[in-house]
C-alpha cells in the first residue's frame, strides 16, 4: 500500500475517533472541568409566590398525579384540602369544561409529632383511552380548579416516549431552576429517584414543608405523572419525637400502583408505559434473599416481555456504582443482591439519586467477584446496564463536589452540578439520552449518548448469526457480546 494511502487511512481513523469522543463520549472517560459560579443551597422563603396557596381557602392544593395501573390506562389524582374535607371527587372528560365522567376517591390524614396534615385525597381514574388528552376538575363552585394530562401511547415495542429524570429536589432556588429547566424540555413523565421535600431537614421534621413542596411541584406534577421512588429523606424515623413508623408522610401523600404489579408494599412496584417496563426498588427496605422485595423482584423480572416493552429500566435511590466520596459504597449490599439479575435479564438503564452530583457509567458488571477469585474490579459487560446517578436536583444540602481523584475505568462522565436528565425512547432499538446542567444558564445538553436496546440488539445479532453458525455457537457469541 502506498505511504500516502496509509497516512490517509490513519488520519481518517483518528478523525472518527475524535468525532465519536466529542459527540457521544462513549469512548472517553471524562470528569467535567466546568467551573460553576457560587450557587448556595438557599431555601425559597416559605411566603414566596412559589409556595402560594390558592386564593380560595376551600380550593384543592398540592395536586399531583401518578400512573394508577400496570399499563398506563389509569391515573391516581391526589390533592389536599384544609378547611373542609369536601367531597373526594374528580370529574373529567376529553374536552375543556365538558366533564362526562366522574370518580370517587378516599380521604385520609395523619399526624407527625406536633403537625397534623390537611385532608389528603386520592382518586383513581381508570379505563382511560391511550394517547388522549383528558381535562379534569377538582372542587365545587368558586373553589374548583381545573387541570389536564395526556395518557401514554398504547404498549408497543416501537412506541416513542420521553421521560424526565429528577432526584433529590428539595425546595431551594436551585430546585426551582431544575424544575423550570425540565418543564422546558419535551419530557412527558418524570421518573423521580427519591428525596422529595427534605422536610426532615427542618426543626422537628416540619410537616408544613411537605405542604410547601406539594404546592411547589404542582406546576408540573398536576399535568403529567411523576413515578415515585422512595429516598432516605422520606424515612423520617425519629424515636426522640415519638415517631417510629417510617415513611409516614410519604405513604400518606404519594400513592403508587403497587397492587397492580403484585407487590406487597407501595415502596417497590413496577409499571409499563409506552415501550418501557419500569421497576422501582426501595433502597431502605429489606432486600436480601427471601425478603418480600427480593421475592417480588425475582418474580417481576420473569414477567418482563421485551417483545412488547423492550426498554427495561430500574429506579432506586442509592446508586450501585458511585465514584463520589459522598455516600461511597452505600449501595454495595443491593448491588451484591441484584446485579447478577440485572445482567441476566439485560436491564438497559439503572437510575439513582442520593449523591448530589451527576455520573454516568459504561456498561459494566462485577458479578464474577468472590472472596477468593481476585476479580474484584468491574469489567466491561455488554449484557449489563448503564448506571446513571441524577441526585443533582438542587436540595438544601448542596452539591457533592469531591469525586475520587482518579476517575475509575467504569465511569464515563461525571460532574458536580445541578441538573436533570431526559430519556427519549425512539423505537425498540434506540434511545436518545441527555443530561442538562442548570448552572450555565443554557438549555443545551452537557452529556448525551445514543443507547442501543439490550434485548433487541442481541436478538438482531442472533438472527444474523443463525444464518451462518450452529445454535450453540450463536448462544456462546451472544452471551459474550
From Swiss-Prot:
pH dependence of this protein's activity: Optimum pH is 7.
EC number in record: 3.1.3.60
Function statement: Phosphoenolpyruvate phosphatase that probably operates in the vacuole to release phosphate from phosphoenolpyruvate (PEP) under phosphorus starvation.
Organism listed in the record: Allium cepa (Onion)
Glycosylation sites: 109, 206, 370, 427
Protein name: Phosphoenolpyruvate phosphatase
Gene of this entry: ACPEPP
UniProt similarity note: Belongs to the metallophosphoesterase superfamily. Purple acid phosphatase family.
Signal peptide: 1-36
Binding site for Zn(2+): 195, 232, 317, 354
Amino acid at each position: 500500500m502506498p505511504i500516502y494511502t496509509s497516512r490517509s487511512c490513519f488520519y481518517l481513523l483518528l478523525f472518527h475517533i475524535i468525532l465519536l469522543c466529542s459527540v457521544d463520549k462513549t469512548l472517553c472517560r471524562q470528569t467535567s472541568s466546568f467551573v460553576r459560579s457560587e450557587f448556595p443551597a438557599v431555601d425559597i422563603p416559605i411566603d414566596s409566590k412559589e409556595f402560594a396557596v390558592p386564593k380560595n381557602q376551600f380550593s384543592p392544593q398540592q395536586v399531583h398525579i401518578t400512573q394508577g395501573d400496570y399499563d398506563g390506562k389509569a391515573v391516581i389524582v391526589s390533592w389536599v384540602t384544609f378547611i373542609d374535607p369536601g367531597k373526594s371527587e374528580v370529574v373529567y372528560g376529553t374536552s375543556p369544561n365538558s366533564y362526562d365522567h366522574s370518580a370517587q376517591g378516599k380521604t385520609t390524614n395523619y399526624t407527625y409529632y406536633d403537625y397534623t396534615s390537611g385532608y389528603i385525597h386520592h382518586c383513581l381514574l381508570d379505563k382511560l383511552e391511550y394517547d388522549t388528552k383528558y381535562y379534569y376538575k377538582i372542587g365545587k363552585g368558586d373553589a374548583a380548579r381545573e387541570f389536564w394530562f395526556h395518557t401514554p401511547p398504547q404498549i408497543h415495542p416501537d412506541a416513542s416516549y420521553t421521560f424526565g429524570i429528577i432526584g433529590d429536589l428539595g425546595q431551594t432556588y436551585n430546585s426551582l431552576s431544575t424544575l423550570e429547566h425540565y418543564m422546558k424540555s419535551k419530557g412527558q413523565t418524570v421518573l423521580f429517584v427519591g428525596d422529595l421535600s427534605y422536610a426532615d431537614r427542618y426543626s422537628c421534621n416540619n410537616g408544613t414543608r411537605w405542604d410547601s413542596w406539594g404546592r411547589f411541584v404542582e406546576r408540573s406534577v398536576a399535568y403529567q405523572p411523576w413515578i415515585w421512588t422512595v429516598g432516605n429523606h422520606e424515612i423520617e424515623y425519629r424515636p426522640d419525637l415519638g415517631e417510629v413508623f417510617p415513611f409516614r408522610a410519604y405513604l400518606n401523600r404519594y400513592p403508587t400502583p403497587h397492587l397492580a404489579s403484585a407487590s406487597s408494599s407501595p415502596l417497590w412496584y413496577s409499571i409499563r408505559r409506552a415501550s418501557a417496563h419500569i421497576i422501582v426498588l426501595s433502597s431502605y427496605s429489606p432486600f436480601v434473599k427471601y425478603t418480600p422485595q427480593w421475592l417480588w423482584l425475582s418474580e417481576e423480572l420473569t414477567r418482563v416481555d421485551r417483545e412488547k416493552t423492550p426498554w427495561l429500566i430500574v429506579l432506586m435511590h442509592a446508586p450501585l456504582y458511585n465514584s463520589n466520596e459522598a455516600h461511597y459504597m452505600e449501595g454495595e449490599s443491593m448491588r451484591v443482591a441484584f446485579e447478577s439479575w440485572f445482567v441476566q435479564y439485560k436491564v438497559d438503564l439503572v437510575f439513582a439519586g442520593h449523591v448530589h452530583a451527576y455520573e454516568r457509567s459504561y456498561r459494566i458488571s462485577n458479578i464474577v467477584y468472590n472472596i477468593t477469585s481476585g476479580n474484584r474490579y468491574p469489567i466491561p459487560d455488554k449484557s449489563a446496564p448503564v448506571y446513571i446517578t441524577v441526585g443533582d436536583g438542587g436540595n438544601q444540602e448542596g452539591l457533592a463536589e469531591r469525586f475520587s481523584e482518579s476517575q475509575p475505568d467504569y465511569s464515563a462522565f461525571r460532574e458536580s452540578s445541578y441538573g436533570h436528565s431526559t430519556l427519549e425512547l425512539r423505537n425498540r432499538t434506540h434511545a436518545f439520552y441527555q443530561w442538562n446542567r442548570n448552572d450555565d444558564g443554557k438549555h443545551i445538553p452537557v452529556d448525551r449518548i445514543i443507547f442501543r436496546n439490550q434485548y433487541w440488539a442481541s436478538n438482531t445479532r442472533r438472527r444474523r448469526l443463525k444464518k451462518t453458525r450452529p445454535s450453540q455457537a450463536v448462544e456462546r457469541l451472544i452471551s459474550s457480546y
